[in-house]
Amino acid sequence: MEVFKDSDVLISTLGLDSHVWGKVPIYMTSGGFDPLHIGHARCILETTEMADADGGYVIVVVNGDGFLKRKKGGAFMPEEERAEIIAGLRGVDAVLIWDDGTQNV
């Protein structure tokens, strides 16, 4: 699946513009995934199972390197590698690397 750094590009690429928004279920989960552990895997699996039952999309938000630097002093793995791992998991439709300069997701 694809990795995005721009939410507008993600929305248009998946065809989730205004005429679809609100009609197709979108399931999202987020985390640092630095490194990916069993709790993350279970959370993503549960999210994909709910989306599968609903015919929805799964978007996983990966906290960017800047977010992790502010939170814990740095990242163990670069954001691109963490996002690539998540994108390779079954049921994940898209990954968004997110860092807006705050600790908000």
Question: Language-model segments: what does each one mean?
Answer:
Residues M1-V105:
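Nucleotidyltransferase catalytic core that binds NTPs
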